[in-house]
């Protein structure tokens, strides 16, 4: 092996070392020479129709694979992707954004170059990126470039957030020492010092042993912090009643007998919220306390009775214990925990059992219209172990909270960024990562299944072309309710601005060049207006197999929406109008008073 290699070869081989196998992006004159290094480094080039979709797809890939990379060109390219990168920051997806930039001498000379603002300032876009990434590097110095790359990649993986790397065109072929590649980047999660966590472990265990009515809530950052297995084991071993948030759905095994669906606060089961408020111990893992994820802030537990696990600190009874890494802390708790001392508490079935509710549903009539009220439960019979299930922002993400998931499934939704159109390109990235990992024996066999609204699909429809180009297996249920239904419920039920142009959705695969009658990549398209039609479609072997591109258009009425959505939008409307200002509470106000004031 040569003693020195080109800087871009070093960069791409590092990406391969940390587990990335494919690169998303769009070619541009500032990154073209860099793209020549992708295949020699053992990476695949995806090639997206636009940069926004490339960013969304990289995010979806990262949520399955753990980390991803997207390449754009300076200025016009990177700004097209910035919405996606901001979403990755907000929801903690590890995306490496590589930007091909103008040569260093051009930048230093303030030359009026294309794709710039024409003012000679080549730093403005990097300054924007710094607000939505956890680490940045401008690879200008050959002596420090490799260390800068390693620093950014390490930060991306360990902090579960995007990073930004600038690669000037005149640095692409700069020679750097090859031997650095022999030492892998340390991506291990930090361990707590021996004995350092003992006090906190004992404090937590004693609270668990003495509790009379315990409750576990698993939230979405649990997976980002790398503690999904520990959370699942805690749920299984304790037998404590467990729920998830919307963002946390699918992280723990939902077939456990002590799993009671989603805790929806003021928008959910009327008996669940009073019961949860009466718990003397709430263990919350990986919290994201956004308005959407907490149902208008109504599910945030009282700090005095809570143990909350963050990435590198824990809150016990409202007291913050710093520099405690949750993975190490949870492993110690699980190792030391005496299950015989735990309370043997069995909650009432009134708290909800999704599987029992699904089994109790009476079969619909053949000619009955497909409805939001039961669709999400009934469609759960279509799922199997290993599936990746994705629900787009809107009625699909809210309805998807009622899905009944088998073991070993993954559910992807958005619970703070909520950029409609995200899920279609994200499904491309997720399906690609799934295919890679199944081939490596790292995932169960399964399908990628997307529930996409008609309005959302129109935002990012070119992603269908990317799916077809890469021959990915994706099953898409297009929920056609003739416009922006969630916006109608928030404001403007009959307003024209919530209407969209009707499309012939099932003709999209043909328009985007999908093959016809190719057994290696089958294309399946069907339309359902009634339950009889939908059930017949769901039973078709081609759809069950999930190979190739499958599109099922599901017709629903324009104003039909999940009941929980109708409850949520009432508080959203009041908050948006200014009727609900964040309260100035006295120190004597109870936690419940504070929460309900905020929630409205």
Segments from the language model and where they lie:
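Active-site phosphate/pyrophosphate- and oxyanion-stabilizing loops and adjacent acidic/basic residues
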Residues: 59, 126-127, 232, 377, ...
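Active-site diphosphate/adenylate-binding microenvironment
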Residues: 8-11, 16-18, 26-36, 350-441
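Thiamine diphosphate
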Residues: 98, 106-119, 278, 327, ...
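Short acidic loop-to-helix transition motifs that present clustered carboxylates
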Residues: 31, 51-56, 78, 396-398, ...
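Generic enzyme active-site microenvironment
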Residues: 217, 308, 390, 451-452
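N-terminal alpha/beta PP-like core and its mobile active-site loop of ThDP/TPP-dependent enzymes
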Residues: 2-340, 473-476
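Phosphate/pyrophosphate-binding active-site segments
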Residues: 2-3, 140-143, 179-180, 203-206, ...
């Amino acid at each position: 092996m040569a003693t020195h290699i080109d800087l871009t070869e070093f960069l791409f081989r590092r990406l391969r070392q940390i587990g990335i196998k494919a690169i998303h992006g769009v070619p541009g004159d500032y990154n073209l020479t860099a793209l020549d290094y992708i295949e020699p480094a053992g990476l695949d080039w995806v090639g997206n129709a636009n940069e926004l979709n490339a960013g969304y797809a990289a995010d979806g890939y990262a949520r399955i694979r753990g980390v991803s990379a997207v390449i754009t060109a300076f200025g016009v390219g990177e700004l097209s992707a910035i919405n996606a990168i901001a979403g990755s920051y907000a929801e903690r997806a590890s995306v490496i954004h590589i930007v091909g930039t103008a040569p260093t001498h051009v930048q230093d000379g303030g030359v009026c170059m294309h794709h710039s603002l024409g003012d000679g300032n080549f730093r403005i876009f990097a300054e924007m990126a710094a607000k939505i990434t956890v680490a940045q590097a401008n690879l200008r110095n050959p002596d420090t470039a490799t260390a800068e790359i390693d620093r950014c990649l390490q930060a991306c993986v360990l902090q579960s957030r995007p990073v930004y790397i600038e690669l000037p065109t005149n640095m692409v072929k700069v020679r750097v020492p090859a031997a650095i590649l022999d030492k892998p980047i340390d991506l291990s999660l930090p361990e707590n010092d021996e004995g350092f966590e003992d006090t906190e472990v004992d404090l937590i265990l004693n609270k668990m042993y003495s509790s009379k009515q315990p409750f576990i809530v698993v939230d979405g950052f649990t997976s980002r912090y790398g503690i999904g297995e520990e959370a699942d084991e805690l749920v299984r071993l304790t037998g404590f009643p467990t729920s998830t948030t919307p963002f946390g759905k699918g992280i723990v095994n939902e077939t456990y007998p002590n799993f009671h669906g989603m805790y929806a606060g003021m928008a959910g089961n009327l008996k669940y919220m009073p019961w949860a408020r009466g718990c003397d111990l709430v263990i919350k893992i990986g919290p994201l306390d956004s308005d959407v994820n907490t149902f208008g802030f109504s599910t945030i537990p009282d700090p005095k009775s809570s143990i909350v696990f963050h990435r590198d600190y824990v809150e016990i009874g409202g007291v913050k214990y710093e520099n405690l890494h949750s993975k190490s802390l949870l492993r110690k708790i699980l190792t030391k925990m005496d299950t015989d001392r735990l309370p043997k508490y069995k909650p009432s079935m009134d708290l909800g059992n999704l599987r029992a509710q699904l089994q109790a549903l009476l079969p619909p009539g053949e000619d009955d219209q497909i409805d939001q009220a039961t669709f999400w439960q009934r469609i759960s019979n279509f799922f199997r172990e290993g599936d990746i299930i994705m629900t787009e922002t809107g009625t699909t993400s809210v309805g998807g909270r009622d899905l009944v998931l088998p073991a070993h499934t993954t559910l992807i939704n958005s619970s703070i960024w909520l950029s409609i159109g995200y899920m279609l390109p994200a499904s491309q990235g997720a399906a690609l990562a799934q295919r890679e990992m199944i081939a490596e024996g790292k995932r169960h066999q399964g399908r990628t299944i997307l529930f996409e609204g008609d309005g959302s699909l129109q935002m990012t429809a070119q992603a269908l072309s990317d799916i077809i180009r890469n021959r990915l297996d994706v099953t898409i249920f297009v929920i056609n309710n003739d416009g922006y239904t969630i916006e109608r419920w928030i404001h403007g039920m009959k307003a024209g601005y919530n209407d969209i142009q009707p499309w012939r959705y099932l003709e999209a695969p043909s328009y985007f060049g999908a093959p016809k009658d190719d057994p290696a990549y089958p294309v399946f398209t069907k339309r359902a207006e009634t339950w009889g039609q939908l059930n017949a479609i769901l039973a078709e072997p081609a759809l069950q197999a999930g190979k190739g591109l499958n599109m099922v258009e599901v017709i629903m009425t324009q104003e039909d929406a999940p009941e929980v959505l109708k409850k949520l939008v009432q508080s959203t409307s009041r908050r948006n109008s200014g009727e609900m200002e964040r309260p100035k509470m006295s120190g004597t106000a109870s936690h419940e008073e504070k929460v309900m004031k905020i929630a409205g």
